[in-house]
Amino acid sequence: MRVVFSSMASKSHLFGLVPLAWAFRAAGHEVRVVASPALTEDITAAGLTAVPVGTDVDLVDFMTHAGHDIIDYVRSLDFSERDPATLTWEHLLGMQTVLTPTFYALMSPDTLIEGMVSFCRKWRPDLVIWEPLTFAAPIAAAVTGTPHARLLWGPDITTRARQNFLGLLPDQPEEHREDPLAEWLTWTLEKYGGPAFDEEVVVGQWTIDPAPAAIRLDTGLKTVGMRYVDYNGPSVVPEWLHDEPERRRVCLTLGISSRENSIGQVSIEELLGAVGDVDAEIIATFDAQQLEGVANIPDNVRTVGFVPMHALLPTCAATVHHGGPGSWHTAAIHGVPQVILPDGWDTGVRAQRTQEFGAGIALPVPELTPDQLRESVKRVLDDPAHRAGAARMRDDMLAEPSPAEVVGICEELAAGRREPR
């Protein structure tokens, strides 16, 4: 088969696609990764073939264009909310109205859609696999009649939000049945001569989910579970990591997609100070810019600009992070208890469900204090229940089909959806 993978302009989102792309290639299929030019180097560094299309979407410019009010609004959304009193029509319509022109349309600009459609028309793939914020991919798949699937990187919050929205849509007066996402996708499909809009363009014809069942949201969609395989980009294991730690080790990271100088109201210096008297070796993945102005680094803290998480976390007794997909999945697949500092989007759902499963502690950022962080780290280190919960989660993830097995499942599903050419 010819298989297209596509990601928004973020290396952390791209990295989630890489292991399955490798598996398709190893099974003898032709693979192309179609994305904006900014990802070309990261794609080729992963040993994959890049097809740069469109113009770059600068995430800093995106944030500036969206504005702080929009960013703050999106961060404030509680995707774990189930109370009908909160999930009103006005609330759900507001979400669709804000997300469609910002996070959805801006991440798939016209140049990217045009490039995706043009490439798929010429190369004629048999399958398109896309991450959930790259709508250019399902648009191109629909226009060319190609089977397509989403590969998730976290709880399927956008589908849950849309299902809640669609559930209330028929109850509205006909003249007020607005659907911003369907409207954008409808006229975009028409522009390229595609079929009528269908919800498959939003959710894929099937979904591939690398998270354990305990973390997934029940959306009722056809879902293929997949064992998570960690990929952190090209990396070298530092010499000090070859040695067994002399005492318990804790990883402290805010991820690679966002190099912030604080989380909520807590600065990097306060984070480091909070873990300074924890009886453990702290490996803090902060670069020089993040450490600028930090006057005191505790004696038990080693700061490193980058270290491959798949090499570091198996040596750790716990990890503290922002709830991002790479940090979370890598810790989970290695059975490491987690202290999660969720700061918006899907991180709150991921943190809440991890705590409910017994594999860690969730500390919502707005209420975060250094004292809370210190005590939470001590709890996950000293309470065997957290280690047991993390081990159960690891076992659940290891029981999922490997990427190689998922290739076979996708072959069968694609064969059943392929249109005559």
Curated annotation (Swiss-Prot):
Family: Belongs to the glycosyltransferase 28 family.
Any one biological process term the GO annotation gives: antibiotic biosynthetic process
Record's protein name: 3-alpha-mycarosylerythronolide B desosaminyl transferase
An example molecular function term from Gene Ontology annotations: UDP-glycosyltransferase activity
KW Transferase (keyword) present: yes
Top enzyme class: transferase
Role description: Catalyzes the conversion of alpha-L-mycarosylerythronolide B into erythromycin D in the erythromycin biosynthesis pathway.
Signal peptide: 1-23
EC number in record: 2.4.1.278
Record key words, sorted: Antibiotic biosynthesis, Glycosyltransferase, Signal, Transferase
Subunit structure: Heterotetramer composed of EryCII and EryCIII.
Pathway terms, separated by semicolons: Antibiotic biosynthesis; erythromycin biosynthesis
Catalysed conversion reaction: 3-O-alpha-L-mycarosylerythronolide B + dTDP-alpha-D-desosamine = erythromycin D + dTDP + H(+)
Source organism (scientific name): Saccharopolyspora erythraea (strain ATCC 11635 / DSM 40517 / JCM 4748 / NBRC 13426 / NCIMB 8594 / NRRL 2338)
Domain of life: Bacteria
Coiled coil start-end: none
Keyword rRNA-binding belongs to the record: no
Pfam families: EryCIII-like_C, EryCIII-like_N
